[in-house]
């Protein structure tokens, strides 16, 4: 059991080292910028927050919408607790 744990830890360490070295190589080639990583994540989170919108039927006589509609997300996302979640 200890052998398997040691193998798993070493494998994870090798994968992390490989990932970091690959990221540094791409950064050195100006393929990615370090600040772009966080900007992309923030944009995705903002899209999730605002993508979940409340849709409702407008009455024929022109009255404003009431809360009888349903929440919808676009692009294959589903609304869970007012956030769009990808399933």
From Swiss-Prot:
The UniProt keyword set, sorted, is: Disulfide bond, Ion channel impairing toxin, Knottin, Secreted, Signal, Toxin
Q: Does the keyword Signal apply?
A: yes
Is GTP-binding one of the keywords UniProt gives this record?
no
Q: Where in the cell is it found?
A: Secreted
Propeptide per record: which residue ranges?
24-51
* Signal sequence bounds: 1-23
State a GO cellular component annotated for this protein.
extracellular region
Q: Which cysteines are joined by disulfide bonds?
A: 52-65, 56-79, 73-84
Family per record? Belongs to the neurotoxin 12 (Hwtx-2) family. 03 (juruin) subfamily.
Write out the function statement from the record. Answer: Probable ion channel inhibitor.
Designated name of the protein = U3-theraphotoxin-Cg1c
Species assigned in the record = Chilobrachys guangxiensis
